[in-house]
């Protein structure tokens, strides 16, 4: 805390009490640049033990940025974590999975890391805007894809409409179906 540098605090193997104690101790230094890292310290971590919802729990409880320490095989957990608001993804990296040591066999290689980064960028973009309503692109093509209520056949003026007299077709530039 004295340097003012950001600190990344892994929550692997920690209870809520452990995390709370560490966060409080850190905050007492006056440095507010702390990121909690949701982590399952199991190598590799099976899907059933990832528990990505803990990211949201940590965000709500501590009201701070939360990242994800990914020890799974493949990119799925990292992509999901990004879509759930993880501010950073930590992923083990190797140039060769056959190297000795416990981390290499589940680490990602250069092409996988590039794909993960590209996927995280796309996932964040896909999260979009929570505001309901058509997007700008949808608005531009709305009339082309929506339907209008139209006469199913030629009808004389003053004719009393029956259900067989109308149909619905594109484009939606006419009378709306509602």
Task: Please name every model-derived segment.
Residues 1-178:
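Catalytic cores and adjacent flexible loops of soluble metabolic enzymes
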């Amino acid at each position: 805390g004295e340097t003012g540098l950001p600190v990344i605090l892994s929550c692997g193997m920690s209870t809520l009490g452990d995390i709370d104690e560490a966060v409080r101790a850190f905050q007492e230094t006056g440095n507010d640049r702390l990121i909690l890292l949701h982590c399952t310290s199991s190598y590799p971590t099976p899907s059933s033990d990832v528990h990505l919802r803990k990211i949201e729990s940590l965000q709500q409880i501590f009201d701070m940025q939360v990242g994800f320490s990914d020890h799974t095989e493949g990119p799925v957990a990292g992509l999901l974590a990004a879509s759930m608001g993880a501010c950073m993804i930590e992923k083990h990296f190797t140039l060769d999975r056959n190297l000795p040591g416990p981390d290499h066999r589940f680490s990602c290689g250069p092409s996988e890391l590039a794909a993960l980064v590209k996927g995280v960028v796309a996932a964040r973009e896909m999260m979009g805007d929570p505001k309901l309503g058509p997007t700008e692109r949808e608005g531009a093509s709305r009339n082309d894809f929506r339907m209008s209520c139209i006469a199913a056949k030629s009808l004389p003026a003053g004719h009393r409409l029956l259900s067989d007299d109308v149909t619905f077709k594109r484009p939606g530039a006419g009378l709306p179906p509602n």
